[in-house]
Amino acid sequence: MQVSTAALAVLLCTMALCNQFSASLAADTPTACCFSYISRQIPQNFIADYFETSSQCSKPSVIFLTKRGRQVCADPSEEWVQKYVSDLELSA
């Protein structure tokens, strides 16, 4: 009976360590960040969706997803970017 208790204890410790390891990996998961913005306005009909970058990024950004599957970094303080985001929210 002691062997099965010891085996159970080892199993529980192993599971706890695995959970800690996977939790730390999830916290370090890379996120999409922008280091520069597009210099010109892109046509709104090219845009399919958008998301905002993580607060962990050094530069706040909006990333537009085009209908062709490309990601375009844009400055969230630009008026056209705010309009596109607003329009996408209304159409969702």
Curated annotation (Swiss-Prot):
Residues 1-23 form the signal peptide. GO terms for cellular component: cytoplasm; cytosol; extracellular space. CDD domains: Chemokine_CC (cd00272). InterPro entries: Chemokine_b/g/d, Chemokine_CC_CS, Chemokine_IL8-like_dom, Interleukin_8-like_sf. GO terms for biological process: antimicrobial humoral immune response mediated by antimicrobial peptide; astrocyte cell migration; calcium ion transport; calcium-mediated signaling; cell activation; cell chemotaxis; cell-cell signaling; cellular response to interleukin-1. Pfam families: IL8. Disulfide bonds join C33-C57, C34-C73. It is found in: Secreted. The keyword Cell cycle does not apply. GO terms for molecular function: CCR chemokine receptor binding; CCR1 chemokine receptor binding; CCR5 chemokine receptor binding; chemoattractant activity; chemokine activity; identical protein binding; kinase activity; phospholipase activator activity. Belongs to the intercrine beta (chemokine CC) family. Monokine with inflammatory and chemokinetic properties. Binds to CCR1, CCR4 and CCR5. One of the major HIV-suppressive factors produced by CD8+ T-cells. Recombinant MIP-1-alpha induces a dose-dependent inhibition of different strains of HIV-1, HIV-2, and simian immunodeficiency virus (SIV). Self-associates. Also heterodimer of MIP-1-alpha(4-69) and MIP-1-beta(3-69). Interacts with CCR1. This is C-C motif chemokine 3. It comes from Pan troglodytes. The lineage of its organism: Eukaryota, Metazoa, Chordata, Craniata, Vertebrata.
